[in-house]
Amino acid sequence: ADEGVAVMKIGADGGLTPLNQVGIDGMRGCFLSTDKAGKFLFVGGYHDGKVTVVHTHSDGRLGRVMDGIFHKGLGSVAERNFRPHISCVMPTPDNKFLCVVDSGVDHINIYTVNPTTGRLKMVDILRCELESAPRWIRFSRDGKFAYVICEHSNEILVYTYDGSGRLPEFELVQKVPTYLDNDESAKAASALKISPSGDYLYCSTAGEETV
């Protein structure tokens, strides 16, 4: 059964105290993020391809579901990606847009979030190569670059980002492989993180078992 999202308060000793729990009207969310103001929680659903917006209170508790959108479409790999699989939900650094990474249909859908109602409106789609399976997106510390790790193509896509206009502008400028060699063993790029200094980008690759 779907148990939604639970909130825990972190104590001074590191202990966790439950605050509350809310359902998301979807199947087992796999990724969480918040907007810069801490007003909304975004939930990505891998199994049902749903992005959910939940209101958050100032004390950390969760409120009601404000909006939810199911992605639609057929993926490029029928054996696995025959339907949408949302694997990451991440606001842009300027808090103007929400990037929803869908590894099932090789898309990154870009939404605006109404600051009052929490309603989502899709304004753009970044279309990645078929069978690449984009998994996570991260932004540079200065907010000028976006990095997307692709699970199937085992590469990191580098985009410039400009959110100064009414619509977001992403331009692909580089592709960097995540593997050490070109052997035929099964491998899948998985996670992506930027170092605190912003000087390094870390990624992990399953199968090859490397960082």
Language-model features: locations:
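Short loop/turn segments immediately following beta-strands, especially the blade-tip
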Residues: 7-14, 53-63, 111-119, 159-169
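Blade-edge beta-strand/turn elements of extracellular beta-propeller
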Residues: 15-21, 62-65, 71-75, 116-129, ...
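Loop/turn-rich, solvent-exposed surfaces of beta-rich toroidal or solenoidal domains
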Residues: 187-211
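Conserved beta-strand positions in repeat-built beta-propeller and related beta-rich domains
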Residues: 1, 43-46, 92, 100-103, ...
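Asp-box/WD-like beta-propeller blade repeats and closely related beta-sheet repeat scaffolds
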Residues: 17-88
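Structural signal for beta-propeller blades
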Residues: 3-5, 49-52, 106-108, 154-156, ...
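Short coil/turn segments that connect the beta-strands within blades of beta-propeller domains
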Residues: 37-39, 94-96, 142-144, 197-199
